[in-house]
Structures are given as C-alpha cells and as structure tokens.
UniProtKB/Swiss-Prot annotation:
Protein name: Protein PerC
Pfam families: PerC
GO molecular function: DNA binding
Task performed by this protein: Transcriptional activator of eaeA/bfpA expression in enteropathogenic E.coli.
Key words, A-Z: Activator, DNA-binding, Plasmid, Transcription, Transcription regulation
Species for this entry: Escherichia coli O127:H6 (strain E2348/69 / EPEC)
InterPro entries (UniProt xref): Tscrpt_act_PerC/SfV_Orf40
Length: 89
C-alpha cells in the first residue's frame, strides 16, 4: 500500500520539509483506514526529522588570520592593528 500526493512529493523534492509535513497532516485527516493513516504519519515524521536543523559549529577564522599575518610578515606589511583582537577559543 502506498499513499501518493503530488503536492507533498513536490515539497519534499524542493526541500520544503516543514511544509511537506503539514501537507501530510492534512492528508491524514482525509484518509479512511488506519493503515493509510499510519503510512502518512510515517512520511510526516520523516519530513519533520529532515526539517530539523543540524548543529552547526561557529566559524573560527583564527587559522585564516594567522595565515594572512604570516603572508603580510613575509611581504613586510606587518601592522598590528589590521585585525581585531578576539578571544581565541
């Protein structure tokens, strides 16, 4: 048994997982059997899981800063006030 919905499929293909999850919730209300509702709930849970944001790490530009500083030093362009002094992690 498979449930098909053009709109939900389109939203999933575009990466709009939150909207697709809402669409699957709308479809669950319209279905008549428990087996179909279970499949729609699984698809909705899949979309909700995909919509969660990944834990992104903050960018750390200290490596770039050090590389630029070394290049400037080689070229004789050393200026201590080029970069702001942020705390290193």
């Amino acid at each position: 048994m498979e449930i098909r919905d053009k709109k939900a499929k389109y939203l999933e293909e575009k990466g709009f997982y939150r909207r697709a999850a809402d669409r699957w919730a709308e479809i669950m209300v319209l279905l008549s059997s428990d087996a179909e509702r279970k499949l729609a709930a699984q698809k909705r849970a899949f979309c909700i899981n995909k919509s969660l944001r990944n834990n992104l790490q903050a960018d750390n530009y200290s490596d770039i800063k050090q590389g630029v500083y070394k290049a400037y030093k080689k070229m004789g362009l050393v200026n201590e006030k080029i970069f702001r002094n942020y705390k290193e992690n």
